[in-house]
Amino acid sequence: MTNIEKQARKIVRDAYFDYLEIDYSNRELKDHFFKIYYHHMQFLEDLFPETTDEDKLESKWRSMFKKERE
């Protein structure tokens, strides 16, 4: 995994919990971010097939890992 991919994964992970402002000026980082983000959303849709709303998927995901971050 390249350094830029690691950065993108960290941003995706942190963004779910901290709602970070993403700096899109780095096109390569932006491309990796969205690639990982859409892969992640597909994973959530598979994990919670009964939930189709993106906000509800993210909420379920955050609640699963809230205790892990505390």
What is the predicted function of each stretch?
Residues 1-9:
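Short, charge/polar-rich alpha-helical segments
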Residues 10-65:
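Acidic, low-complexity, intrinsically disordered interaction modules
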